[in-house]
């Protein structure tokens, strides 16, 4: 029991004996020292921690204290009053001794109580008196933050405690201070001298202990990895920075691969060792760390096209492949072996990235070589064409003005971009003339050119197939619409020519020449002879009416529009100027249905304005005005024959198209029975 009491290593605190209410002394530990009491906590916490006055506390007997026990001596017996209390030291007296057994009598009890005990439960009476204020001394030392965890273990203070001569050293967790308790004053003076040295040596010991623990773990890991899969490779010294990555990013990425257990790096030998559970995990981690350098030979004449404008092509290869960089070796750089006429392109990156870059570059080189072969074939074809006499037509020849510079085929000395496009020459030699090329976008026909060529051919064909009697003279509206103007018909319209011929002499002119063309009345404009022509010469063919190839719509003016719309004022039946009549809607079939129907149907015919309409209009005007005096004797008979039929006509032209009687009269005027 004495060793247990004196060894301050078992519990954090100064061991003492505390007197209970029954007079027995129980084992406790001093946790703190106050003015008139000490803070005690008991063994096994059978009682709560509390402050006890100095008069109820004493120190345990010294470890070397030994006294022979005889009959009649007072002793202390280690016993307990009941099962609920722990054992304590009770005062008793020896009544009888027989071998190793002692009969003792307790003195604390009122009634005499005897018990037989062995020698292990007996000890001489404790020679230490009850404690006083000067029985305990305490020293506190502030503990650095990095050493608080280490100071919580009392074993690290063993040498420090021995050097001080203190009874107990422990860390107070409440205020993170090191408590030094002693029963003498000497340790208090030594603590200020050895405190700093103790903390410094403690920090060094902790560092060494952590290294030893790390080495132990490494040893265990190495034993486990010896039976696992392993990958070992070496990286060039100048590429070690790329392999490690920024702040070790590549190594961290490799360690995150599932199945990788450890990665070792030999900085002196630039060697990586990868340990993993599977060979696939080791190879994947290796692909992140193994950086190297490789080159691709590029023909000298294709270097510019491989690099591209402003390095666009080679930059695309770098971005897609993932290599770190690419270097084009100059002629003065002889580090890497090169072939004759070739320029090395040196790529730096991982094995996989370099392989991707080589595949992209080789494909681009094959494409450039095929394009060059196609260009040479085209040059051979052009040379053969020159030899057989056709020759090579330069781009833009035969095109309209302003079109030769915008579209066309480039020559053999064109830029490399024009060589990528596929061109055809078939449309330049087998078309319908220089203005009808349809081979490609460079020779696309223009609508103005094609229309002009077709119109001129029709001009040359019209005099042969159309006579002077079976052509209809164009109306003023049609002639003004077909008269060539500047540009494409977007210029200012021609000056108007006021006329009202059909109001004054339309009837007389028809009666004078019944066999003439009645539709000539609708032409209200006089043809202008060209300036260079003689008065007696006929107008040139270009001034004749040309039939437009464009399909007419409802907005186009027709023969009736030209007859009803004149530039001058119209005369009404009263001889006064009136506004122009509303235009009738045009129908394209009216120009095709000029003849009279045999059945006399008017509703389904919808003919344009005929001569009979003008005759009817003139008769209605003659009722209000005196008749014309320009009639001849040869006209009287004709007028007499027609007077009866004219008198049966309505006063004005019908607006709903009922023109059956005028159609018959028109047939008689034209001389058709």
Curated annotation (Swiss-Prot):
InterPro entries: Agenet-like_dom, FMR1, FMR1-like_C_core, FMRP_KH0, FXR1_C1, KH_dom, KH_dom_type_1, KH_dom_type_1_sf. SMART domains: KH. Pfam families: Agenet, FXMRP1_C_core, FXR_C1, KH_1, KH_9, Tudor_FRX1. GO terms for cellular component: cytoplasm; cytoplasmic stress granule; cytosol; membrane; neuron projection; nucleus; postsynapse; presynapse. Residues 411-421 have a biased composition (Polar residues). Its main location: cytoplasm. mRNA-binding protein that acts as a regulator of mRNAs translation and/or stability, and which is required for adult hippocampal neurogenesis. Specifically binds to AU-rich elements (AREs) in the 3'-UTR of target mRNAs. Promotes formation of some phase-separated membraneless compartment by undergoing liquid-liquid phase separation upon binding to AREs-containing mRNAs: mRNAs storage into membraneless compartments regulates their translation and/or stability. This is RNA-binding protein FXR2. It comes from Homo sapiens (Human). The gene is FXR2.
